[in-house]
Amino acid sequence: MTRTVLITGATSGIGEAAAHAFAGAGWRVIATGRRAERLDALVAALGADSVHPLVFDICDEAARDAALAELPAEFADIDLLINNAGLALGTKPADQANVDQWKTMIATNVTALVSMTHRLLPGLIARKGAIINISSVAATYPYTGGNVYGGTKAFVEQFSLGLRSDLHGKGVRVTSIEPGMIETEFTLVRTAGDQAASDTLYSGADPMTGGDLAETLLWIAQLPPHLNINRLEIMPVSQSFAGFQVARNG
């Protein structure tokens, strides 16, 4: 029986790679995002029988609900939700940060994620489906300038554990996956398009790729139904935990 996955933020990075991985494994993929041309390219590459695009802003609940209401029958029964859409904005410490960027991160990484989850929960419970939430190592290991971004990802981690508790006995699997350095458009978005900053961050670091995470997501999704990965932290070998910072006199 063919299963269906809905992937938010499927126009680039982890989400785009996941769409390729799941379609390649025989899943039907509902790919969501704001950039219609990117979603059209996915359909062209993977086929309309495998991928159905939904164009909307993840923070626009009315647009989301309208798009979901128009799903073709063969894509309507969703077995897996991958909450991937998210972003970091700004690199400044809290006293210099832009509060509007903070609000956008909370709206995208927290509010939109919980709203999408709530919207799909009845069907996921009925089908004993699964939810995979993309958190970050920033939820556990703070760094300068990661203030609100790290806080939103810590929320995702705790929300995932709370869902596991709430859904106990209903057969729904919930996973929080917490990736470290991965080369996507993440830094370009965070720095408002600073290509040099992005190149510097990843240069020589041998970071993870979207494909690495996509294969991990597929592995989790295809585990036997009696197994649940609660949390999974994954980094490139080149990355480790940040050391404690010390401010010295003089």
Residue ranges of model-derived segments:
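C-terminal helical subdomain
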Residues: 176-180, 195-243
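The beta1-alpha1 cofactor-binding region of Rossmann-like NAD(H)/NADP(H)-dependent oxidoreductases
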Residues: 55-66, 99
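Residue(s) in the substrate-gating loop at a strand-loop-helix junction
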Residues: 136
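Substrate-binding pocket helix/loop in short-chain dehydrogenase/reductase
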Residues: 92-94, 98-104
